[in-house]
C-alpha cells in the first residue's frame, strides 16, 4: 500500500521533513516513490511548509493513504493558502 508520510532529514536538533509517497513497508527515511513537499518546523523566516497539491490529489486518487501528521499539515496548508 502507498502511504504519504514524513521522512526526516536535517541534522541533530535541527529537523527537516520531506513529505514523500512511499510503500508502507519501506523504512521511514528509506526509499520513496516521489517527494510531494517539505515541512521545516524550525523555520523562522521563509517558507516552513510546501505541499504540491496536484501531486497530493493524484496520489490520493490512486489510493494512497495519508499519515495522521500529514493530514494535519495538509489542513494547515489549506488554511494558509487563501490568506496568501
Swiss-Prot record:
Single GO MF annotation: structural constituent of ribosome
Domain of life: Bacteria
InterPro entries membership: Ribosomal_bS16, Ribosomal_bS16_dom_sf
GO CC, any one term: cytoplasm
Keyword Ribonucleoprotein: yes
Record keywords, A-Z: Ribonucleoprotein, Ribosomal protein
Single GO biological process annotation from the record: translation
Family of this protein: Belongs to the bacterial ribosomal protein bS16 family.
NCBIfam families linked: S16 (TIGR00002)
PANTHER family to which the protein is assigned, alphabetical: 30S RIBOSOMAL PROTEIN S16, SMALL RIBOSOMAL SUBUNIT PROTEIN BS16M
Protein name stated in the entry: Small ribosomal subunit protein bS16
